[in-house]
Curated annotation (Swiss-Prot):
This is UPF0391 membrane protein Shewmr4_2671. It is a multi-pass membrane protein. Its main location: membrane. It is found in: Cell membrane. Belongs to the UPF0391 family. It holds the Pfam family DUF1328. GO terms for cellular component: plasma membrane. The keyword Transmembrane helix applies. The chain crosses the membrane at residues 6-26, 28-48. Keywords: Cell membrane, Membrane, Transmembrane, Transmembrane helix.
Amino acid sequence: MLGWTLMFLVVAIIAGLFGFTGIAGAAAGIAKIIFFLFIVLLVISLLVNALKGKAPRA
């Protein structure tokens, strides 16, 4: 859990730097691409788990 906390802290700091320095427009375009990429990966992961017959871990 500490690892996740540190990762989210770093992400929050980077997001704050982007927001306060005015380069948020470029970062937003990249974020949209990454968002849809991870949505596709999520769907693929769910399909693979469904085909294997395993329940997803909580």
